[in-house]
Amino acid sequence: MRPNARAINQPRPIKITRHYTKHAEGSVLVEFGETKVICTATVEDSVPRFLKGQGKGWVTAEYGMLPRSTHSRMQREAAKGKQGGRTMEIQRLIARSLRAMVDLEALGERAITLDCDVIQADGGTRTASITGACVALIDAINFLLQNGTLTTNPIKGLVAAISVGIVNGETVCDLEYVEDSIAETDMNVVMMEDGRMIEVQGTAEGEPFSHAELLTLLDLAKQGCEQLFVAQRVALAE
């Protein structure tokens, strides 16, 4: 039986709280069960040097975990003097995922940075970050539309992400830490609301998985993301 007696295709309880901080153009607290991430969107009227003069905008992301977001205290990466490989991989994934939902030409020569700060980790921090940052990004775009900076909405659609895996021989959706730590297969799927996939990251931690199991995992991810899109729409309607 899964933790909290969840069905195999049932994500953890999802909660998205908008306008969570005061200063950012968009801010969200996203909760996937006990995993909690603050996502803020910051708008700047400039772009990276490689984009200057091209009439296009940019969306990027940074990711970090508070020292006591986990069971034992982690040293801050700032104290170490460099970012770890996991951090860089995750923030690039978040940035790629969010760029897929934006028409960068319609955004104009401005950049939006999504900061995803994990305040409590219980598995799925990268998928929660993407799902919450999507809403924060939309709020930042709405801010630009409302003040007249933008006249065309550059948002193509919602983006959400969820983990799936094989645990004790069973395919399951939205793994929490106790499942993730023993999973035979672990996969993260990022999807647009029209069903197209942005990224699939899958690894066999033990026994290799079959083609049939892969298709089952992707179907579970689609079912899970559809529930996340509902949660995003509900939050954006509030």
UniProtKB/Swiss-Prot annotation:
Taxonomic superkingdom: Bacteria
GO process terms (BP): rRNA catabolic process; rRNA processing; tRNA processing
CDD domains: RNase_PH_bact
Enzyme class: transferase
One GO MF term attached to the UniProt entry: 3'-5'-RNA exonuclease activity
Keyword tRNA-binding: yes
SS bond partners: none
EC number(s) given by UniProt: 2.7.7.56
Reaction catalysis annotation: tRNA(n+1) + phosphate = tRNA(n) + a ribonucleoside 5'-diphosphate
Annotated residues for binding of phosphate: 86, 124-126
InterPro entries linked: ExoRNase_PH_dom1, ExoRNase_PH_dom2, ExoRNase_PH_dom2_sf, PNPase/RNase_PH_dom_sf, Ribosomal_Su5_D2-typ_SF, RNase_PH, RNase_PH_bac-type, RNase_PH_CS
Keywords: Nucleotidyltransferase, RNA-binding, rRNA processing, Transferase, tRNA processing, tRNA-binding
Function according to Swiss-Prot or TrEMBL: Phosphorolytic 3'-5' exoribonuclease that plays an important role in tRNA 3'-end maturation. Removes nucleotide residues following the 3'-CCA terminus of tRNAs; can also add nucleotides to the ends of RNA molecules by using nucleoside diphosphates as substrates, but this may not be physiologically important. Probably plays a role in initiation of 16S rRNA degradation (leading to ribosome degradation) during starvation.
HAMAP family in UniProt: RNase_PH
Family the entry assigns: Belongs to the RNase PH family.
Alphabetical list of NCBIfam families matching this protein: RNasePH (TIGR01966)
Subunit structure: Homohexameric ring arranged as a trimer of dimers.
Name assigned to this protein: Ribonuclease PH
Organism of derivation: Histophilus somni (strain 2336) (Haemophilus somnus)
Gene: rph
